[in-house]
């Protein structure tokens, strides 16, 4: 997802190329902006009031990653901005359901993208070939062709 975001925001890609200390912010902003797991199901353990509707205990509830684009939480939520003031997100969950692999995923993303920038500081995307992977859980690319400069 970051490769595509950087192709669409080359100025921010250049900022990271020049200042690698921006990696942590970049990875988290990408996870906020393009969550890999846009929805998750949970069972309600007790009756829950949600917008004047009671969700009974035992019900399944589907939660969406739209929280990452909530305008009450983020200024310009539909804008990719690695210098955003508050880049917290719910892509890895929260509380007891927080992803155990979150730190490893961040590290893998940083290492892969760091190497990509080292080898090819400029690139674009072949938009005609884009194809999301057909899965019901994790969001990612089946095909994302990068055009190297």
Q: Language-model segments: what does each one mean?
A:
Residues 1-149:
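Cytochrome P450
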């Amino acid at each position: 997802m970051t490769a595509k975001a950087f192709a669409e925001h080359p100025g921010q890609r250049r900022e990271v190329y020049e200042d690698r200390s921006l990696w942590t912010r970049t990875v988290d902003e990408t996870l906020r902006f393009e969550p890999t797991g846009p929805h998750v199901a949970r069972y309600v353990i007790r009756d829950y009031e949600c917008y004047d509707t009671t969700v009974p205990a035992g019900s399944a509830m589907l939660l969406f990653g739209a929280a990452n684009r909530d305008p009450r939480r983020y200024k310009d939520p539909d804008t990719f901005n690695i210098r955003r003031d508050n880049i917290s997100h719910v892509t890895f969950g929260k509380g007891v359901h927080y992803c155990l692999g979150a730190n490893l995923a961040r590290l893998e993303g940083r290492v892969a993208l760091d190497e990509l920038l080292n080898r090819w500081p400029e690139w674009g995307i072949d938009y005609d070939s884009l194809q999301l992977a057909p899965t019901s859980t994790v969001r990612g690319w089946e095909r994302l062709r990068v055009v190297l400069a």
